[in-house]
């Protein structure tokens, strides 16, 4: 039994869940996947063990992602997944429940917010607070958001891309679009079917994205050998795919992200745009690691763009750092991003 309740920060992402424990840092990074027995409803595996079962389960076992496009699509499975992860991190805490901050996309609705809060409470939290992902990402990237200075953060996760201009600990202008890492994988599926008549699995698409995926021309082309099923013969097929092909495959989702960035800049007050020109654009999230994304944004906006150090963990780190402000929260506070109490 845990003797002292721990404050916990959770990056509840479509692709992964990262858990930050106060005083310890990020202690868990697992895929947002659960495996269940359809006949009994029994939860079999969560996280990495469940992900390994994607596309490889017998008829009575199904591996699913309970979050889609940044929000809960299966409430029961999300609650059970969170319960397992929290138990793994802090053990039994029936008498000493933790306070928890959970990250959410900036465009989330009140109904979706309530679903996240309720899932956290049912999973074992004493109290649940929310923080918008770009705010947490900025804090995790080391940006001092309390100053009257404009900063732009582009957080590309698994289900959503969140773009925000932040100043004085608040979001001045933002956009959240359902185009991110999952849509890049979907673009690979479509491209492989259209160009090669080959069907590839989810894990293969993820491998292609991370090894040869790019959104800006590379100085030296790279290739990868992939295995899939030929749609003509129905038999296994091995082909080589190049990074140049990924440029073509990713064109549509990349353009939508660029349009969202341009839209936020257009709506931002001129003084803050000047600040952003000086401070640059900071990218976070797993999607920011697709090769050349920073170069492309810089080329299209004319603003210096960098990928944050440890971009995948920035949101979780920022959530964790926000735990220090919980004692200052007023009763009834739910979404920390809408109250300037982060400093």
Predicted feature locations:
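Nucleotide/phosphate-binding catalytic cleft detector across ATP-hydrolyzing
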Residues: 1-156, 164-281, 288-343
């Amino acid at each position: 039994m845990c003797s002292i309740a721990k404050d916990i920060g959770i990056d509840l992402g479509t692709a992964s869940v990262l858990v930050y424990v106060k005083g310890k840092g990020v202690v868990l990074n697992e895929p947002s996947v659960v495996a269940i027995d359809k006949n009994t409803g029994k939860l079999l595996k969560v996280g990495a063990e469940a992900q390994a079962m994607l596309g490889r389960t017998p008829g009575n076992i199904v591996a699913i992602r309970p979050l889609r496009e940044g929000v809960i699509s299966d409430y029961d499975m999300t609650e059970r997944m969170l319960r397992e992860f929290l138990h793994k991190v802090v053990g039994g805490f029936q008498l000493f429940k933790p306070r928890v901050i959970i990250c959410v996309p900036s465009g989330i609705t009140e109904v979706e917010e309530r679903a996240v809060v309720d899932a956290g409470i049912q999973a074992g939290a004493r109290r649940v607070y929310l923080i918008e992902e770009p705010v947490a990402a900025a804090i995790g990237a080391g940006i001092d958001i309390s100053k009257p200075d404009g900063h732009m953060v582009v957080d590309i996760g698994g289900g959503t891309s969140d773009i925000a201009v932040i100043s004085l600990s608040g979001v001045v202008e933002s956009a959240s679009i359902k185009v991110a890492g999952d849509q890049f994988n979907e673009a690979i599926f479509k491209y492989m079917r259209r160009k090669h008549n080959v069907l590839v699995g989810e894990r293969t698409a993820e491998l292609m994205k991370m090894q040869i995926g790019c959104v800006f021309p590379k100085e030296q082309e790279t290739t990868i050998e992939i295995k899939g099923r030929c749609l003509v013969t129905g038999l296994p097929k091995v082909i080589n795919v190049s990074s140049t092909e990924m440029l073509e495959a990713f064109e549509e989702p990349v353009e939508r992200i660029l349009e969202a960035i341009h839209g936020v800049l257009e709506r931002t007050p001129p003084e803050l745009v000047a600040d952003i020109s000086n401070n640059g654009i900071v990218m976070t999230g797993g999607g920011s690691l697709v090769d050349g994304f920073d170069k492309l944004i810089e080329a299209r906006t004319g603003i210096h763009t960098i990928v944050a150090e440890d971009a995948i963990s920035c949101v979780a780190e920022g959530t964790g750092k926000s735990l220090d402000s919980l004692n200052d929260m007023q009763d009834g506070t739910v979404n920390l991003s809408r109250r300037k109490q982060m400093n």
